Swiss-Prot record:
It comes from Chlorobium phaeobacteroides (strain DSM 266 / SMG 266 / 2430). It holds the Pfam family DXP_reductoisom. It comes from the Bacteria. Catalyzes the NADPH-dependent rearrangement and reduction of 1-deoxy-D-xylulose-5-phosphate (DXP) to 2-C-methyl-D-erythritol 4-phosphate (MEP). Keywords: Isoprene biosynthesis, Manganese, Metal-binding, NADP, Oxidoreductase. This is 1-deoxy-D-xylulose 5-phosphate reductoisomerase. GO terms for molecular function: 1-deoxy-D-xylulose-5-phosphate reductoisomerase activity; manganese ion binding; NADPH binding.
Length: 384
């Protein structure tokens, strides 16, 4: 029996994780849940999974939750500190880190310092502070199992092979809803169009990141830290069918790939059951039914966010943290219909150009770069 705490339990990854857990009551229990936006959903989760402690976004939400639950309720915490408390709590063997954005960094680090193995769905944790996180994981003998489908595919394709035998990692990208949209048409893209991903069902923020290809850029940075691979050995190929989730090419010319239907429950099940496997509930892969698989190069001219991510990784220091923070602000502004689709990349680019990078050592120094970039990007959005 493995006990889990889930950070971001009411989001897309959290709901999918609980769906896998629901299928295997003999294999998984829930110690803690943390959520940010849906107290009503959290109430249902508490009644079904009976966690010992939970966290919500703020004091008002905590009071609302306590009122809804009545006398029989778990310990209730709130804010980033509350999520960190849930992450580090005794009783959990593994923490599923699925809070969206840089807000997941502090709770994930708390879990690592408490010696919890991590099922990592929050790629921003590695983007913002990859060196710090990997150093802490090594220090506390913590295993980080990626939940992103691409990194899960690479993780599985690397097992049993030597690091020095790897020629390169190949991340696949669906291309998003605008794969064949012209640069001129991209300037007129609506929010509703951008939220219609052709293959994956995800939250709003990651869906927009997929449309701009920033999601793939963030995944390149995450892969660098997870697999100790330099930027020039991490490639991206567009694969619209989203059946091959990523590949590893070895020095002998052999390529290992992981295939499956595009359903996040598969990499989630792999991560939370590791090193065993368990049924995930996804549709079975039927290659004759799919018929053919296609591939093409990404277009950096139409999708500059991918280029910006590579540039931030090459520059290092605080640049990836600034890239991520500026993107979070720009995407939020697009979701609020305050800026256009192509303004997202422009905001990120201008924020990065204004930044004087430095080498962070402490968590606070990483967070300071994050705060600076958010303020800069907010100013750019207001003037857009």
């Amino acid at each position: 029996m493995r006990s889990l705490s889930i950070l971001g339990s009411t989001g897309s990854i959290g709901l999918s994780t609980l769906d896998v857990v629901r299928q295997h009551p003999e294999q998984f229990t829930i110690t803690g849940l943390a959520e940010g936006h849906d107290v009503g959903m959290l109430v249902k989760q508490i009644r079904e999974f009976n966690p010992r402690l939970v966290s919500v976004r703020n004091a008002d939400a905590a009071a609302e939750l306590a009122s809804l639950l009545g006398n029989e309720k778990p310990e209730i915490f709130y804010g980033i500190e509350g999520a960190a408390t849930v992450a580090a709590a005794d009783g959990a063997d593994m923490v599923v880190s699925a809070i969206v954005g840089a807000a997941g960094l502090v709770p994930t680090i708390s879990a690592i310092k408490a010696g919890k193995n991590i099922a990592l769905a929050n790629k921003e944790t590695m983007v913002v502070a990859g060196r710090l996180v990997t150093d802490l994981a090594r220090q506390h003998k913590v295993t980080i199992i990626p939940v992103d489908s691409e990194h899960s595919a690479i993780y599985q394709s690397l097992l049993g092979h030597r690091h020095e035998d790897v020629l390169r990692l190949i991340l696949t990208a669906s291309g998003g809803p605008f794969l064949n949209t012209s640069a001129e048409e991209l300037r007129e893209v609506t929010l509703e169009q951008a939220l219609k991903h052709p293959k994956w069902t995800m939250g709003a923020k990651i869906t927009i990141d997929s449309a701009t290809l920033m999601n793939k850029g963030l995944e390149v940075i995450e892969a660098h830290w997870l697999f100790d691979m330099p930027a020039h050995k991490i490639g991206v190929v567009v694969h619209p069918q989203s059946i091959i989730h990523s590949m590893v090419e070895y020095i002998d010319g052999c390529v290992m790939a992981q295939l499956g239907m595009p359903d996040m429950r598969a990499p989630i099940a792999y991560a939370i059951a590791y090193p065993e496997r368990c049924p995930s509930g996804i549709e079975r892969l039927d290659l004759p039914k799919i018929g053919s698989l296609s591939f093409q190069e990404p277009d950096p001219g139409r999708f500059p966010c991918l280029r910006l991510a590579y540039e931030s990784l090459e520059a290092g220091r605080t640049c990836p943290a600034v890239l991520n923070a500026a993107n979070e602000i720009a995407v939020a502004a697009f979701l609020d219909k305050r800026i256009g689709f192509t303004d997202i990349a422009d905001t990120v680019d201008k924020t990065m150009q204004a930044h004087e990078a430095y080498t962070p050592v402490s968590l606070e120094e990483y967070l300071e770069a994050d705060r600076w970039a958010r303020e800069m990007a907010k100013g750019l959005v207001e003037r857009a």
